[in-house]
């Protein structure tokens, strides 16, 4: 996807880079080995470098850390994000899939570093309103950080994609890690 977007940016939008907001994120498998996943400094910086190369860009506007890392100290992960901003490879940082208490700790670390943390990304749709129930939405408001939804169409369940069964090329049929057949009910 990043290579394709990079080609489109080069071919059609290079004159408009200052008008575009481009983001990317890291936190899941990028390559085999001990540093190909999660939230270590080595992983985050190398992941962003690879993304920038694929995109053909010098920087992104927002770089997200995709998920909390149970093995890497939060200070290391936030320090890596701060280094990325200070190096000019990202203008702002965001977090994704962080719970409320960890979001608060991360925000405090980034504030101390004077790192521009502006947004938190979470699953949010009419079918999944967890962030309203677990206090994360209120935490983000109190911390004065934005929230951006991922999967606002509930992985296609809020479209006509599954009205007539499960298409052979659908996520349920081909992957099933994130959307399972049991999620499709008469109510959904």
Which positions does each model-derived feature cover?
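N-terminal binding-site loop/beta-alpha segment at the start of enzyme catalytic domains
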Residues: 1-24, 58, 86
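A short, structured active-site edge motif that brings together acidic residues
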Residues: 17-30, 121-124
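Conserved beta-strand positions
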Residues: 24, 62-65, 95, 122
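A short acidic, helix-capping loop that chelates divalent metal ions and anchors anionic groups
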Residues: 29-35, 158
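Short, solvent-exposed loop/turn segments at secondary-structure boundaries
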Residues: 34-38, 131-132
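Short, acidic/polar
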Residues: 37-56, 74-79, 103-107
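Beta/alpha (TIM)-barrel catalytic core signal, keyed to glycine-rich beta->alpha loops juxtaposed to Asp/Glu
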Residues: 70-188
